[in-house]
Curated annotation (Swiss-Prot):
This is NADPH dehydrogenase. One of its GO terms (molecular function) is NADPH dehydrogenase activity. Gene3D superfamilies: Aldolase class I. It is an enzyme of class 1 (oxidoreductase). FMN binds at S23, P24, M25, C26, A60, Q102, R215, G307, R308. The gene is namA. It comes from Bacillus anthracis.
Length: 345
């Protein structure tokens, strides 16, 4: 039986063997608090590759040490961090998948002893510290850090880079009027609020010619915040700059009540795909092969990002293939266990 979920997908010169992407999820497992990859990361990501995920995306990886969410985040701010990341991509490639990395800066959501940096001195909520408004020098230094992180990503063997522009972290904070109260060239109008991301994309394009994704929060869930229609314009600009795919998440720039249900964010991937004419990834409570297949068949997205379901079951692609009646090519080491496996949870 044919399956869209298990059909290949090519972006630039990178071909994924199927449309399943491991969504970036922080593991907070750099135990020495130095940003280094540990044995856990190798097993964690290598297992999902062996489980037949098409693209394994490494968790949010900090471009600067002060840009970590926690002290145990992975980092890519120094050349000494390349070796561990290269071991990770080797694990992933050796097990048949492509490797991606999400480059990130936590902004005002950094829970470190040092000052949190943000576009404006506006805290996320009343329990978090008031961030320091970034100077122009700090903004330019952060843009340079993203560029240097892209260079290190290439040296580490990654096939795809994703810029983390979602979930209330630094780039999202610049984009949203709820967190960006600046009156200079990086605040005010949509064009000015986009400037920080624009300059990051431009800087990465100078050193990286592989597939480039951006994760967005397509809805602020606040009457004075951004909606998916605002992101249509933003993503049109991203496409003009050469971004290849928009990973469509939502929320978390301010505290908000969100109506969560299976596939609740697919609508954003569909809207951006249709109105900005750019490839999209759907993410959020996608838990079955049939659900993922329907999203692709309905042309609502191009890739399916799976998060928690891959934490519950690293071999989710096998279950999805069984569900869809698709014969999945197994690693030769597992050929002694042919046939269907249980889909019971």
């Amino acid at each position: 039986m044919n399956s869209e979920l298990f059909s290949p997908y090519t972006i630039k010169d990178v071909t994924l063997k199927n449309r399943i992407v491991m969504s970036p999820m922080c593991m907070y497992s750099s135990e020495n608090e130095d940003g280094q990859v540990t044995n856990f990361h190798l097993i964690h990501y290598g297992t999902r590759a062996a489980g037949q995920v098409g693209l394994v995306m490494i968790e949010a990886t900090a471009v600067l040490p002060e840009g970590r969410i926690s002290n145990k985040d992975l980092g890519i701010w120094d050349d000494s961090l390349i070796e561990g990341l290269h071991k990770t991509t080797t694990f992933i490639h050796d097990n048949g998948a492509k490797a991606a990395i999400q480059l990130a800066h936590a902004g005002r959501k950094a829970e470190l002893e040092t000052d949190a940096l943000a576009p404006s001195a506006v805290p996320f909520n009343e329990t978090m510290k008031i961030p320091v408004e970034m100077s122009i020098h700090q903004i330019k230094n952060t843009i340079l850090a993203f560029q240097q992180a892209a260079i290190r990503s290439k040296q580490a063997g990654f096939d795809v880079i994703e810029i983390h522009g979602a979930h209330g972290y630094l780039i999202n904070e610049f984009l949203s009027p709820l967190s960006n109260k600046r009156t200079d060239e990086y605040g005010g109008s949509p064009e000015n609020r986009y400037r920080f991301l624009r300059e990051i994309i431009d800087s990465i394009n100078e050193v990286w010619n592989g597939p480039l994704f951006v994760r967005i929060s397509a809805n602020d869930y606040h009457p004075d915040g951004l909606t998916v229609q605002d992101y249509v314009q933003y993503t049109k600009w991203m496409k003009e700059q050469g971004v290849d795919l928009i990973d469509c998440s939502s929320g978390a720039v301010v505290p908000a009540r969100i109506d969560v249900y299976p596939g609740y964010q697919v609508q954003y991937a569909k809207h951006i795909k249709e109105h900005a004419n750019i490839a999209t990834g759907a993410v959020g409570l996608i838990t079955t092969g049939a659900q993922a297949e329907q999203i692709l068949n309905n042309n609502e997205a191009d890739l399916i990002f799976i998060g928690r379901e891959l934490l519950r079951n690293p071999y989710f692609p096998r279950i999805a293939a069984n569900e869809l009646g698709f014969e999945l090519e197994e690693p030769h080491q597992y050929e002694r266990a042919p046939g269907k496996i249980s889909t019971n949870k």
